[in-house]
């Protein structure tokens, strides 16, 4: 298996959404995960939206973002047929490297409760669980 990591492009959009569905990630194609939103995000996060490709087939994604002081790992997903083969680890490391090049010294991620494989990946990669934090949000658009 010769999986390569490369920046995602707009032409990958349909494959990204299909991969997220196969891997069980919730997606919001009507709004924040729409093609238009994805295009805007690609421009804003140049070099941080990465895909794992087996030949031309998209088998994994990781979306790196930052607020100029902290990096974020988002949407780390691997096709179920490619899980437990190191693809997630390679995507995580590639994202860390890309964020470090942007000057990020701290990288964080939100992991859905009950997602033990993802939590284990981050633990094995040196991430610490921060128990004193609580995630809060406010939807300015109820469909967001």
Kindly give the residue locations of the regions a language model identified.
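Extreme N-terminal starter segment of soluble prokaryotic enzymes
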Residues: 2-4
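Short, conserved catalytic or interaction motifs in soluble domains
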Residues: 78
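Conserved beta-strand-loop-alpha-helix junction that forms the acyl-donor binding cleft
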Residues: 83, 109-118
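Acetyl-CoA-dependent GNAT
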Residues: 7-75, 98, 129-141
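Short acidic, glycine/proline-enriched helix-loop-strand junctions
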Residues: 117-129
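Conserved acetyl-CoA-binding loop-helix of GNAT-fold acetyltransferases
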Residues: 84-97, 124
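Conserved GNAT acetyl-CoA-binding A-motif
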Residues: 92, 99-111
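Short phosphate-binding/catalytic loops that engage adenosine nucleotides
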Residues: 87, 104, 127
């Amino acid at each position: 298996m010769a999986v390569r990591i490369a920046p995602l492009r707009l032409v990958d959009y349909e494959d990204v959404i299909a991969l997220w569905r196969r891997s069980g990630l919730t997606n919001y194609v009507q709004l924040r995960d729409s093609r238009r939103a994805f295009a805007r995000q690609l421009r804003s996060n140049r070099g941080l939206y990465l895909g794992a490709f087996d030949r031309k087939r998209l088998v994994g994604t990781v979306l790196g973002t930052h607020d100029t002081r902290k990096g974020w790992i988002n949407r780390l997903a691997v096709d179920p047929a490619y899980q437990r083969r190191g693809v997630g680890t390679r995507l995580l490391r590639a994202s860390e490297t890309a964020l470090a090049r942007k000057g990020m010294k701290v990288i964080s991620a939100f992991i859905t409760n009950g997602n033990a494989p993802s939590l284990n990946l981050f633990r094995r990669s040196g991430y610490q669980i921060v128990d004193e934090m609580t995630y809060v949000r406010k939807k300015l658009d109820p469909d967001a």
